[in-house]
Regions:
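Core, soluble structural subunits of large cytosolic macromolecular machines
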Residues: 1-446
Length: 446
């Protein structure tokens, strides 16, 4: 009875076991590595990814290719997750991760065919990994400022033409140096730098600007468009009379009743804006809308206001100015206000943009230019990779020789170390060393 129920439950399930399952998993890893192998190296090729809706992405970035690929095999999905983890940790080495994992699986498959138990292979790989990490630490060197710049440039090799990679390496290094004093966590550099795209100009006309830049203009042209320092308030909500959230009807029994409702609305707005004026607010940023009646009141009090900000922009503005994000204007206190050092509007590609420079924290905006969306998006990816590497390099200034030299050295070191192991783990350590040699081979091909 139990066997019958299990049979019905697995009726539509394909089950692989034994050698067949191992071969299937290794083939999936090899296919994934083969799809991105040609992107690695100074002459690596770009990939064009075409979505179901016809849109396309042209990129040399391994993790971008993998995350946009339509993959069903569970082993391939696991490798893509490993590549994404590598990207979050180091902002580089995503393609290398897949190639190494694929080679290690193929070498492990050969050992299994020779009769080596998988647990022995896992133990041998673990020993080899620990030894490789210790040896890598031993041969690492502090690069100095010039060496850091060269390391960032090396990380971008093959992601674009020489001039583009040189340009974004310098831009990324400059941004990382400005952020260096504040430390930060894993995604610190991504959160502190906003990215905007502009169709006017070439990619080499891109620029890094201090402060938060948004394609916004003040809600009234009579409001000050340039303020040299002041107080800012951030409202996560709206500055208008909210509609009732329940179904209700109101009976008007006198000619002045409707007017009284309107006057009450105006009185509430006047009270809120008066509260801001008493606090000395110079700049008001609102996530949602601002009522037309409120605009005139803000103008009369000399408060410059902006509306319809995205949540990430509010958070970055909060960081660089020290302002707390409030949900109720009447509850804003002096301690909730932030300081900005400069505010002005600038026309970029015939569109007015607002620039707010904070005085509490470092925040920047990179303006990536290009004639097509594909070029601009790839420029942003190149900058992001360079910034991630530069930020981590400043925090942990150790580098290894490039061009596959470090992998070749570690491979030789592990082969020598394996001779000191008297058990069957020696075979797995040698297989690990052989897998490391795949990177110099691919670089020689590309």
């Amino acid at each position: 009875m139990v066997e019958s129920e299990h049979g019905e439950a697995l009726e539509d399930t394909e089950r692989l076991q034994g050698r067949g399952a191992l071969v299937n998993n290794v083939k999936a890893a090899s296919a994934l590595a083969g799809a991105i192998r040609s992107t690695l190296g100074p002459k690596g090729l770009n990939k064009m990814l075409v979505e179901a809706d016809g849109s396309s992405i042209v990129t040399n970035d391994g993790v971008t290719v993998l995350e946009n690929a339509n993959v069903e095999h569970p082993t391939a999905k696991m490798l893509i997750q490993a590549s994404s983890s590598q990207d979050r940790a180091a902002r580089d080495g995503t393609t290398t991760t897949i190639i190494l994992a694929s080679e290690m699986l193929q070498n492990a498959m050969e050992l299994v065919s020779m009769g080596v138990h998988p647990s022995v292979i896992v133990n041998g790989y673990s020993i080899a990994l620990s030894e490789a990490i210790e040896e890598a630490k031993r041969i690492a060197r502090a690069p100095g400022k010039t060496g850091m710049g060269l390391a960032v440039r090396t990380a971008l090799e093959g992601k674009g033409d020489t001039r583009t990679c040189d340009f974004f390496a310098k831009l990324a290094m400059g941004a990382a140096e400005r952020l260096a004093q504040e430390g930060g966590g894993e995604d610190f550099e991504r959160l502190r730098v906003k990215r905007i795209q502009v169709s006017e100009g070439e990619i080499l006309d891109s620029e890094l600007v201090d402060g938060l830049i948004l394609p916004k203009s003040r809600v009234d042209i009579h409001m000050p468009d340039s303020i040299n320092g002041g107080l800012v308030a951030i409202l996560d909500g709206e500055l208008e009379q909210r509609s009732l959230e329940i179904s209700a009807s109101i009976e008007i029994d006198s000619p002045g009743a409707l007017s009284a409702f309107h006057e009450k609305k105006i009185e509430n707005l006047r009270s809120q804006i008066g509260h801001l004026a008493k606090l000395g607010v110079d700049l008001l940023v609102v996530r949602d809308g601002i009522a037309d009646e409120a605009i005139n009141m803000l103008t009369s009090h000399g408060i410059t206001a902006y509306r319809r900000f995205e949540r990430p922009d509010l958070e970055l503005l909060s960081v660089i100015t020290g302002a707390k994000i409030s949900r109720n204007i009447m509850e804003i206190s002096p301690n909730d206000l932030g300081d900005f050092s400069n505010h002005f509007e600038r026309r970029i590609s015939d569109v007015k943009h607002t620039i707010i420079e904070g005085s509490k924290g470092t925040g920047m905006t990179v303006i990536v230019r290009g004639t097509s969306k594909t070029i601009r998006e790839e420029g942003i990816r190149i900058f992001d990779d360079g910034l991630g590497v530069a930020h981590r390099l400043i925090r942990n200034p150790d580098v290894l020789p490039g061009g596959g030299a470090s992998y070749a050295h570690l491979s030789r070191y592990l082969r020598s170390f394996a001779l000191s192991c008297a058990n069957r783990e020696q075979l797995a350590i040698e297989a690990f060393a052989s897998a490391l040699e795949s990177i110099p081979r691919v670089l020689a091909e590309n």
